[in-house]
Amino acid sequence: PQEFEEIIVHYLSHGDKQLAKRALKMGLQQHPSFHGLLLLQSEIYILDENYEVAIKLLEYIEKLNPFDEEISLQRANIASKKGDHISSINYLHKALKISDDPDEIWNLLGMEHLLVENYIEASYFFKNCLSNNPDDYPSLYNLLYCYEQLNMTEAAINSLNEVLESDPYCEVAWHQLGKVYLKCGKIKEALSAFEFAIISDDRFTGAYIEKGKLLESL
């Protein structure tokens, strides 16, 4: 049954839902109660927006495998798609309790909190993602967005400096640091940050543009 799983996941990741459905049908004919295939069936129901059918199937799977985090992740996905972000957050916390790999769930929790404009909670989860992986630039951008909404300039500077401590040649962090300094009127520091971004990656056009605009305005 795992071979079928791999084939279905491959098709879904390439956006070929029809071939995924065909492979799933064959798999379930041979292994009708294999929970990995049943979870893929519910995932396809979700893609087709058959949410109620997916929920019933997930409830059935949960009776067989109550400690599978994927069940809660799919329930969270359904709740989010239906606009019920609070329920989605609750399901994600349930998944987090039994997960060995929290990064993805932290990110999802951050995104759900963003959607309800709870920037403090969102920033907590994006910061967790960043602590685990300083190269997680989407989480860095989301964290900086939260701090911007909260007017927490110092927190933004501190987070960027933490990234730079682990990777002093991170052009993205230098570039963002320059933009934060610029917003709070620290022109000299902003210019230095843009220059360090260029030193870190001399093909990074964003830093050249920001530096050029800054020099023009002086």
What are these regions (language model features)?
Residues S13, L47, K81-K82, L115-V116, ...:
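Register position in tetratricopeptide repeats
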Residues Q30, K63-N65, K97-S99, N132-N133, ...:
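Structural marker of alpha-solenoid helical repeat scaffolds
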